[in-house]
Each structure stands twice: as C-alpha cells, then as structure tokens.
C-alpha cells in the first residue's frame, strides 16, 4: 500500500506537463530557425492570412460590383462611347489600306473611294501621306487641334516617321476641324492654305452637315497646294441674313403720323359731336 500511494509513484500520472515538454523539445529545436523572434517575415504573413475570410470576401465583392458598374457606364453611356472611340483611334494606328478613319460614320463609299484615289496618287508622287479622321464628339481634349496633335504623336512617335505625314480631323458635333502634320507636310502645303481650309472648307460645309463635301473639298485644296496648282478656294458662304422684326426709322415715323391723324380725328369727333348736339338742343328751346 505504501508503495502504491507514495508520491513518487503518483507523480508521473498527475504531472504530465514535463513529459509533454520533453517529447516536443526535438520538434521545437528543429523549427528554431523559423521562430518569429528571428525572422519577422513569417510573423507578418501569418497575421495577414489569419484574418476572417468573410471580410475579404465582402471587400472583393464590393470591388467587383464597382468595377462592373464602371464598365457598364462606360459601355452604354454616350460619354463612355465617345471616349472609347477617341482612344480606339489612337491605339489602332493609321489606316493601312485606306486614308480615312470614319469613326463618326458620315462619309459615303463614293467619298472614301475618291479620297483613296486622290491621296494614294499624292503619296506615290510626292511621298506625302494625308489621313482624314471624323469623330462625333471630343471628351478627352478641349478642341480638334489638341486631338489632332495627339493623334500625330501617337501614330508617328518620331520626327522621322511624322515628317511627311498630315492629319485632318473633323468633329461633327462641334462643326469644326483641324489640320496638323510634320515639318515637310506643313512646308509643302503652306500656312495660308492650311488656315483657309480650317476656317472655310471644314466648318462652313459641316455647319450644313455636308460632311462628304467638307472632307473631299479640303483634300482637293490641300493636294492642289502641294502640287503648286491654283487654289480652288473655299465654299461660297450663303447670305444667312434674316428679315428683322423691327421697323425702320422711316416706317416708324410713317406709322406715327398715321396714328396721330387717327387720334386727332377721334378727339375732334368726341368734342364736336356732343357740342353740336348741345347747341341744337338749346336752339330748339
């Protein structure tokens, strides 16, 4: 009995902790190189990945919904469509088989065919390439000139590439256009013809929504200048003078005289007739 109830005999089953430490000691020794006190990296990674997964799921869901909403907005809104068209023109680069990027969809097949014949002949003879771009509306740039410069720099990044290139941009909603190009192109056309084409051919005809004529007449005028031919000139500006609703001075004076006569006659009748009736009544008595 004493042997069974002695403290030494009871110590192993009542105190298993030292035995547990002794058994796990080799494992602890083998992982001593990855202790948090030695390397802070595993500690931070451990903390990051032990966060509740439900919270990360909610954050990802919110970000996904926000991205979806933004994508739908850009896809179906007019601003998003216009913005996409502008950047598509920049990223797609210059047209290879034609000389026209009709993003606005306002040019006919006949106009595109005539432009291809005219501009391909120009490129073959003069080694100058001229491209036309139509856009409905600008949202990324303030005006057509800024956008034209942006297209030129994007399509032809170096001076050597853009030296003999020219770009004509027509904004249909704003009824305006712009022309830009490399040094060789600008010198071949001349500043006067460039200014005249931008201020006459493009805006005047675009205002009447004659986009085909605006583009083709501009091309012919630029090609004529490059070939040294006489300037065909711009379109004839129609006299849009409207009839005024206001009377002239002469008409006003004439109406005023007639009005005075009528008023004077009415006043005479108003005073004379009662007086005549009064005197007639008195004379009878």
From Swiss-Prot:
Basic and acidic residues composition bias: residue spans: 238-251
Record has Plastid as a keyword: yes
Pfam families tied to this protein: TPM_phosphatase
Keywords: Chloroplast, Membrane, Plastid, Thylakoid, Transit peptide, Transmembrane, Transmembrane helix
Highest taxon, organism lineage: Eukaryota
GO cellular component: a single term: chloroplast thylakoid membrane
Annotated region described as Disordered, given as residue ranges: 1-48, 228-251
Biological processes per GO annotation: photosystem II repair
Main subcellular location: plastid
Entry keyword Transmembrane: yes
Record's protein name: UPF0603 protein At1g54780, chloroplastic
């Amino acid at each position: 009995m004493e042997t069974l109830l002695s403290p030494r005999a009871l110590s192993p089953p009542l105190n298993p902790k030292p035995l547990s430490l002794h058994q796990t000691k080799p494992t602890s020794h083998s992982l001593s190189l990855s202790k948090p006190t030695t390397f802070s990296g595993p500690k931070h990674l451990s903390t990051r990945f032990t966060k509740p997964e439900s919270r990360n799921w909610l954050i990802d869901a919110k970000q996904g919904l926000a991205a979806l909403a933004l994508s739908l907005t850009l896809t179906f809104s007019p601003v998003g469509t216009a913005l996409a068209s502008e950047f598509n023109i920049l990223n797609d680069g210059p047209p290879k088989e034609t000389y026209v990027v009709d993003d606005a969809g306002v040019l006919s097949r006949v106009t595109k065919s005539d432009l291809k014949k005219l501009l391909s002949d120009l490129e073959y003879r003069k080694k100058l390439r001229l491209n036309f771009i139509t856009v409905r509306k600008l949202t990324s740039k303030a005006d057509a000139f800024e956008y034209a410069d942006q297209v030129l720099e994007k399509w032809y990044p170096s001076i050597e590439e853009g030296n003999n290139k020219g770009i004509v941009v027509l904004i249909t909603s704003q009824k305006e256009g712009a022309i830009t190009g490399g040094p060789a192109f600008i010198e071949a056309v001349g500043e006067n013809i460039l200014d005249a084409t931008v201020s006459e051919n493009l805006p005047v005809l675009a205002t009447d929504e004659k986009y085909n004529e605006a583009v083709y007449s501009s091309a012919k005028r630029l090609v004529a200048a490059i070939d040294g031919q006489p300037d065909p000139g711009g379109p004839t500006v129609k006299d849009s003078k409207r009839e005024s609703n206001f009377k002239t001075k002469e008409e006003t004076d004439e109406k005023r005289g007639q009005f005075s006569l009528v008023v004077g006659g009415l006043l005479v009748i108003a005073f004379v007739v009662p007086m005549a009736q009064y005197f007639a009544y008195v004379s009878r008595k």
